[in-house]
Design a protein with these regions (language model features):
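Extended carbohydrate-recognition surfaces in non-catalytic/accessory domains of CAZymes
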Residues: 40-150, 224-255, 382-383, 608-640, ...
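Accessory beta-strand-rich segments of carbohydrate-active enzymes
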Residues: 43, 47, 66-72, 124-256, ...
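Carbohydrate-binding surfaces of carbohydrate-active enzymes
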Residues: 50-53, 280-285, 360, 601-886, ...
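Active-site-adjacent substrate/metal-binding segments within catalytic domains
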Residues: 101-139, 144-151, 155-162, 168-174, ...
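Extended acidic/polar, glycine-enriched regions
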Residues: 189-193, 279-382
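Short acidic/polar inter-strand loop motif in beta-rich domains
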Residues: 201-208, 358-364, 785-794, 919-923
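Low-complexity, Pro/Ser/Thr- and charge-rich linker/hinge segments at domain boundaries
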Residues: 219-236, 254-261, 374-391, 803-824
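Substrate-binding/catalytic cleft of secreted carbohydrate-active enzymes
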Residues: 431-615, 627, 640, 644, ...
Length: 927
């Protein structure tokens, strides 16, 4: 369950004048119920000391909702929220939470919005100019003194009505990221049916024309030539308006417990003890004085229980912060604690904290959260090319991450998020960045459990960085929003970094207000004020925190990342990658209509990013045409694109390990996943179909790997091969073997190195290679890393051209374009011999597992073979899916294996389709 959600403790802040006050929350639920059309569905139950009544209830209002436009609706809020109001003509909401356009798509009003240009041609573009009513009825549990409605995500303004009474107006309920807690005790009907109505007013301001509103922006993530307002204000037709995060009713007694926090001190470099400090807010909601005991209990299986308590007296309506420090309570110094580590370095162990307010030894309020014992520090070095790094538990963390995005319509889908996070772990990325687009708390909880570090912060370029256009309300909303998100994020072990801005740096009044909120809420992690090097003081002095965003945002050849002459390929970068990403053909045909598949046309551009350098897919078309040859179909073009994405993405991640810690500390790929079927940068697409970038990244992110630098230095006359170790343990006695094959499959060079030692987090030189064969226009470099006994640990296969890729001088390294002075010629791969492969598939011992064997009986190279698990011979690939490797190359008279696995709950694979580059597919049954 949630760090808070298991007992109804989602942190929040009530909007106040000036700096936002810490929220008062009834974190007293012990039974988590989900209200679904008037019925309770028990999700989690934690037994208290019988026969005491429950300390509280947390009811998610997820069912029975309806939606309608307020345009032309004569009824006011009092009428709409009254019992018996006839909403039969309204649109039934299939699932909540949901934005307006998300509901209209799910309900079939505007179906299949992501296909072709439907998002433009099939939807009225003025949905954001209308107000919208959300309405539901629910039963409120009886027997409690206080009832709160919690709205953690409303976009953008709202009136809240309950049982014919207005609870809050749109002057108070404003801000996409502000959490609103509303006391509805005087308006609710305990034990009876209640009617809730929410009138949503979408974001309407257009920056540069009539100010801003602090919602969120897709900026160049969608093409503003088609969607939104030209020149930088892109949006879908409802502007993501609606109730986009879960709504809860919280019922409790006289005392509520506010958002709790735990901070950790480690005696670094030692980690054999930990000093914990626990913070909790308590509030007396009654009109009489209350006395009790506040108890904090920390548990973890296999560890001694820690319990601390102190008496508390509260006057009527008094709220107070209670702290438990290890100086006062020695038991809060843990001996030999289980630490939370990123999954690449260890186990992400979690502890449970429960806080009870007891009266007469009976809990009357309860809060709970899960936390990790760990420390995170940001370190700023003296380097000039970006020199910010993160240290976890005293250990340097080389960040090789990617940027997560929710769905374009902000669909709430924890199962999809779980699949995305599993992909992140399967890939090997060790950080996910969220540039606003702050998803539900469930996303953070899953990251805690999986050991995936997260970086959060505000969006670039639009509302959040147009400070000169902010009015008084915007400043208030900004403070409320930050306090809400920090209160939600701070207990979570996976959250490592908060950025107060992206491309810009807040003006001093805003920056100081942000910093005060972070300090007041005991933010235990790293903070930066900008993640770029663009900001300047009035005298021209750079104002930055060691992180930069110099790109590139277009494809680069592998040698670029190792050359050492391009600034963007080193240092600490918050985003870089390829903003023109072509998915596998199976995905391409899922969103481009058949008559628009080829040649590339406006329907493709509709699904591209907005930056002029990316909107026409200019760079990736140039790359594919000049390096792999012109295409005659969309399928041919997409197949070639997988080669290009594989080699470039692999090189980006490899270089940030092989380049050494002194000059390489952070690279975050732009982006991890697709927010809709799109050509905007991603490692895997909206359909969760892994392509060339995925398996290239997976190779580049192997914790222990052998890396070839694509002859990046020495004018293509010498290449360096290195061993990188991003695993948790030092290694020694390793062996490296590198062979060069020509196009006919003959071995033209064979070199070995032995006795290689490489420490954790380090890199070691293995050997150098001379030029490849002069009589083979393309050749293969096969690099193997072996255990001391010769067992293969990993293999990397690189294809190289006699004609080199050369970006030219650093001045050519423009962020949004690929301009080279010479291009590799890979066209010989189009006519390479395609051997007849022997392919078999065998079911594994566990459900959903399949081993695919690819045997090459010929003397030629079998190049770039992809396996797909299927349910039937002609079906689409099962998705989501995991393979230990794919797009494999099988050398003469050898056999390769691919291990495939369908995640639990997925269909049973019965067939496998295998396709080599430029060849026809082979389909075999799973035995």
């Amino acid at each position: 369950m949630s760090a808070h959600g298991g007992v109804g403790t989602s942190p929040a802040v009530l909007p106040k004048s000036g700096i936002v006050a810490r929220t008062w929350l009834a974190l007293s639920a012990v039974v988590l119920l989900v209200l679904c059309a008037g019925d309770y569905r028990v999700l989690d139950y934690r037994l208290l000391t019988a026969p005491s009544p429950p300390a509280g209830q947390n009811v998610e209002l997820s069912g029975g909702w309806k939606l309608t436009s307020a345009t032309g609706l004569p009824a006011d809020g009092a009428t709409v929220s009254a019992a018996g109001y006839d909403d039969a003509a309204w649109t039934a909401v299939p699932r909540m939470p949901a934005t307006v356009l998300g509901i209209l798509q799910d309900a079939g009003v505007y179906p299949n919005l992501y296909y072709g240009t439907n998002l433009l041609t099939e939807v009225p573009q003025d949905l954001y100019l209308q107000d919208w009513w959300y309405r539901t009825t629910f039963s409120a549990p009886a027997g409690f003194a206080t009832y709160l409605l919690d709205f953690p995500g409303i976009n953008y303004r709202a009136e809240i009505w309950l049982n014919g009474r207005r609870i809050a107006g749109s002057d108070r309920i404003v801000g996409m990221y502000a959490d609103h807690q509303l006391d509805v005790t005087s308006s609710i009907a305990p034990g009876g049916l209640n009617t809730l109505a929410v009138k949503i007013t979408p974001e309407r301001a257009v920056q540069g024309l009539d100010g801003v509103e602090l919602a969120d922006s897709w900026y160049d993530w969608i093409n503003w030539r088609y969607l939104g307002h030209r020149d930088g204000v892109s949006f879908v037709s409802d502007r993501n308006a609606g109730v986009w995060k879960p709504v809860h009713l919280r019922a409790f007694g006289e005392v509520g417990i506010g958002p709790a926090a735990v901070t950790t001190e480690l005696p670094l470099p030692a980690t054999d003890s930990a000093r914990l400090t626990v913070y909790a807010d308590v509030r007396n909601h009654s009109a009489v004085s209350v006395r009790g005991v506040l108890r904090a209990t920390i548990t973890r299986e296999g560890k001694d229980t820690v319990r601390v308590e102190q008496p508390v007296s509260l006057e009527p309506d008094e709220r107070r912060e209670i702290a438990y420090s290890p100086d006062e309570f020695p038991q809060l110094t843990l001996i030999r604690p289980d630490l939370w580590w990123p999954y690449t370095l260890g186990r992400p162990d979690l502890y449970d904290l429960r806080i009870d307010f007891l009266q007469n030894r009976t809990p009357t309020a309860t809060a709970a959260l899960r936390f990790g014992v760990r420390t995170v520090h940001g370190v700023r070095g003296a380097g000039g090319d970006g020199d910010f790094s993160l240290r976890v538990n005293g250990r340097d963390l080389l960040v090789r991450g990617a940027t997560y995005t929710p769905d374009l319509l902000y669909s709430y889908d924890p199962d999809r998020d779980a699949a995305i996070l599993r992909y992140a772990r399967d890939l090997g990325v060790n950080m996910l960045r969220l540039e606003s687009k702050i998803a539900s708390e469930r996303f953070v909880e899953m990251a805690d459990e999986m050991g995936i570090p997260l970086m959060y912060g505000w969006m670039c370029c639009n509302q959040w960085e147009r400070w000169q256009q902010w009015d008084g309300e915007d400043h208030r909303v900004a403070r409320d929003s930050l306090a809400s998100q920090i209160a939600m994020l701070r207990p979570h072990a996976s959250v490592f970094l908060w950025a107060n801005a992206s491309d810009g740096r807040p003006p001093e009044d805003v920056r100081l207000a942000y910093r005060r909120i972070l300090e007041d809420l005991y933010w235990p992690n790293a903070v930066v004020d900008t993640v770029s090097s663009f900001a300047r003081a009035p005298d021209g002095t750079p104002l930055w925190d060691g992180i930069e965003m110099a790109g590139p945002y277009s494809w680069r050849p592998p040698s670029y990342w190792f050359a050492g002459r391009y600034r963007a390929a080193r240092g600490s970068s918050a985003e870089q990658g390829d903003n023109e990403h072509i998915p596998p053909f199976a995905s391409l045909r899922s969103f481009i209509p058949p008559d628009k598949l080829w040649p590339i046309n406006d329907t493709w551009y509709f699904h591209a990013g907005a930056n002029p350098g990316n909107a026409g897919l200019t760079s990736i078309r140039r790359v594919i045409d000049l390096r792999y040859g012109t295409s005659t179909s969309a399928e041919m073009f997409a197949d070639k694109a997988q080669l290009a994405h594989y080699e470039s993405t692999r090189a980006q991640f490899e270089s940030f390990a092989a380049g050494g810690w002194d000059s390489h500390k952070m690279t975050i790929y732009w982006m991890l996943n697709g927010h809709w079927p799109s050509f905007f940068g991603n490692i895997f697409d909206y359909y969760l179909r892994p392509g060339g970038a995925y398996y290239g990244a997976k190779k580049g992110l192997r914790p222990l790997s052998v890396v070839f630098d694509s002859y990046a230095t020495g004018e293509h006359r010498q290449a360096h091969v290195r061993v990188v170790n991003q695993g948790p343990d030092d290694r020694k006695g390793l062996r490296v073997r590198v062979r060069i094959y020509d196009l006919s499959g003959r071995v033209r060079d064979d070199r070995r190195a032995e006795g290689i030692a490489v420490e954790s987090g380090g890199v070691a030189a293995a050997l150098t290679l001379g030029p490849g064969p002069t009589d083979s226009p393309v050749f293969f470099v096969r690099a193997e890393l072996l255990e001391p006994d010769g067992t293969r640990l990993t293999e990397n296969v690189y294809w190289q051209s006699r004609q080199i890729d050369d970006l030219g001088p650093p001045e050519n390294d423009t962020a949004f374009a690929t301009t080279q002075v010479s291009w590799a010629d890979m066209t010989a791969l189009n006519t390479i011999a395609r051997p007849r492969m022997n392919i078999t598939a065998r079911a594994g011992e566990s459900a959903g597992e399949v081993t695919v064997r690819l045997s090459n009986p010929s003397p030629t190279v079998a190049f770039f073979y992809r396996a797909e698990l299927l349910t039937s011979p002609d079906s689409d690939e099962i998705l989501p899916i995991e393979y230990d490797d794919n797009y494999v190359t099988v050398f003469p008279h050898e056999t390769a294996e691919i291990q495939g696995r369908v995640p639990p709950g997925g269909p049973t694979p019965g067939w496998v389709r295998v396709t080599g580059y430029g060849g026809e597919p082979t389909v075999v049954p799973v035995d």
